[in-house]
Amino acid sequence: MQLSHLLLAFAMIFVMTIMYAPQVQADAWADANADADVNCEVTPYHPDCRGVMP
């Protein structure tokens, strides 16, 4: 009986991991995109900064 409870616990952990993983990946992509924004004060000659800085 203990083995079936252990298998049930692992199955629940596995299912919860599968359900939670896409949200973690989406958050990671959002953070990476926010970090990738060009800082025109640091790199004023970057092509994305044309017309932003004098």
UniProtKB/Swiss-Prot annotation:
GO terms for molecular function: toxin activity. GO terms for cellular component: extracellular region. Residues 27-38 form a propeptide. Residues 1-26 form the signal peptide. InterPro entries: Pilosulin (IPR049518). Expressed by the venom gland. The keyword Ribonucleoprotein does not apply. Keywords: Disulfide bond, Secreted, Signal, Toxin. It is found in: Secreted. Belongs to the formicidae venom precursor-01 superfamily. This is U-myrmicitoxin(01)-Tb5a. It comes from Tetramorium bicarinatum (Tramp ant).
